C-alpha cells in the first residue's frame, strides 16, 4: 500500500498554488495518496489546529507536508500531543534552524527539509526594479532551485545564531 500524505497549505496565493501543483505533479503516477489539503495560513497555531483535525479524521497518516517550517512546528506539536510521533514523518520547508538541528541529529520524524533561498527574494526585487527602469520587457519564467536538506548535508545549512 502507498503512503498516505496530509498536506498543510499556506494561504491562497500564486506561490502556494505553484508549490502544491509541483507537489502533486511529483506524486503523479506513484502509489502515494493525498488524504487532505487544508490552508493553515503560514501560521503554527493554525497548523496545530488543522493537524489536530487530520489526526482525529485519519487513523493512518504516513507523512505530512507542511509548506513552511513555521507550520511544521505546529504540526509536530499536535502529533506529539496525540502521542503519534512514531507513526509519521513531517517535511516542512525554509530551513528553520530548529528543524535543521533535528535533521542533523537524525530525528526519524524529520528526515528532510528544503530551502527557500533568499535569492528568490533578491532576484524578484531586481527583476521588478529593472521592469520599471529599463525599456527592455521583463518577461519569462524564472526558476530558482531549492536544496534538499538531509542528515548528510544538514550541517552546512545549520546556523545556530540565525533568528529563524
Regions found by a protein language model. Name each.
Residues 1-164:
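A residue-level marker of the well-folded mature domains of exported/periplasmic proteins
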Amino acid at each position: 500500500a502507498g503512503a498516505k500524505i496530509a498536506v498543510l497549505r499556506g494561504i491562497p496565493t500564486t506561490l502556494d498554488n505553484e508549490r502544491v501543483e509541483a507537489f502533486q505533479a511529483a506524486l503523479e503516477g506513484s502509489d502515494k495518496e493525498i488524504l487532505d489539503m487544508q490552508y493553515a495560513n503560514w501560521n503554527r497555531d493554525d497548523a496545530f489546529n488543522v493537524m489536530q483535525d487530520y489526526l482525529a479524521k485519519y487513523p493512518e497518516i504516513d507523512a505530512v507536508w507542511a509548506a513552511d517550517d513555521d507550520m511544521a512546528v505546529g504540526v509536530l506539536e499536535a502529533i506529539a500531543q496525540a502521542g503519534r510521533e512514531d507513526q509519521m514523518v513531517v517535511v516542512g520547508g525554509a530551513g528553520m534552524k530548529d528543524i535543521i538541528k533535528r535533521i542533523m541529529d537524525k530525528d526519524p520524524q524529520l528526515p528532510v527539509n528544503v530551502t527557500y533561498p533568499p535569492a528568490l527574494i533578491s532576484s524578484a526585487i531586481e527583476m521588478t526594479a529593472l521592469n520599471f527602469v529599463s525599456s527592455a520587457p521583463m518577461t519569462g519564467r524564472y526558476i530558482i532551485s531549492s536544496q534538499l536538506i538531509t542528515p548528510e548535508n544538514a550541517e552546512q545549512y545549520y546556523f545556530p545564531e540565525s533568528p529563524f
